[in-house]
Amino acid sequence: AELALSEPERRLLQELNQRGVRYLVVGMSAALLQGARGLTEDIDLWFEDLSDLQIGDAVRAAGGIWASGSFGMRPPAIGGDALEDRFDVVTHCHGLADFIVELESAVSVSVEGVELKLLPLERIVASKRAANRPKDVAAWPALETARAVRRELELNAET
């Protein structure tokens, strides 16, 4: 599966990486990059530390606007004309361990020359099951199929 990035989107992810910001791509965008079928327009980012000032610096370097959510009025958000609303900032992942624990099992992929760390499919499934929203329930079959295919490929690679 491909994830087409605009130049500002690619720049944001590169800036986050170069600045050492620790984040995971989660949700359906991460699942699609691991072979699941489905649709999503958003790229869900789960940051280790939302108070990291480097996040705002990276967003601004990519031409975007960072709303840290630190005033408690609304959740954190990445936006602006260049980045629009493609990125969603995830503040809590249902059914998962702490960020640092999940980061240890992250899947690394390269998308258009940008290294990304993805939440593994089995953890996406766990999170979707725990959240249990209608859109999550609808995604289960595609996620389970992708998980089964991935397991089969791994078994074949071992033999």
PLM region descriptions:
Residues A1-T159:
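Compositionally biased terminal segments of proteins
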